[in-house]
Amino acid sequence: MSSLAQALRVHRLVQDDVALRMLRMDSLPLVAGVLATHLGAPNASLPTHELHDALDAELDTLRDHLDLSGRTAKAYCEDWRQAGLLERRIADEAREEVYELTPAARQGLRVVEQLLAPRASVTESRLVSLLTALHQLA
């Protein structure tokens, strides 16, 4: 495959893939902090009013540390729904609207978690060297 063809494929991917768009959002710290906390568990859903209330309660503190606008929680959630990060549906058992993360949002949050995780950089040969040195000390 030529460089041009590969570059065009990646360009289309960046434009079309919801997870990649999420990773490029200015609100990614807010998305990763709030949505992972409240909806990050497998199969998690939350009534829309509960997520709005939780996010509104957190926005005051988050604004002290992040460069956030004065937007409401409801406005952020609507933006994230339109961006393909949140799905809003009627819950079967409660007959109220709930939010859930989309598969693309979960994928994007996994990438963020992987990048935040400490990396183990000890190689097998380094471990052997350390064990040999410990054995010689004993």
Specify the residue positions occupied by each region the protein language model found.
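Short helix-capping/hinge SLiMs at alpha-helix to coil transitions
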Residues: H38-S45
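Non-transmembrane, amphipathic alpha-helical segments
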Residues: A19-L23, N43, T72, E100
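Short, hydrophobic/amphipathic alpha-helical patches that form generic packing surfaces
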Residues: P29-T37
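Generic structural signal for short, flexible, solvent-exposed coil/loop and linker residues
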Residues: S2-S3, R9-R12, L35, K74-A75, ...
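Intrinsically disordered, low-complexity serine/threonine- and proline-rich regulatory segments
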Residues: M1-L30
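Extended assembly-interface/linker segments at domain junctions
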Residues: P47-L137
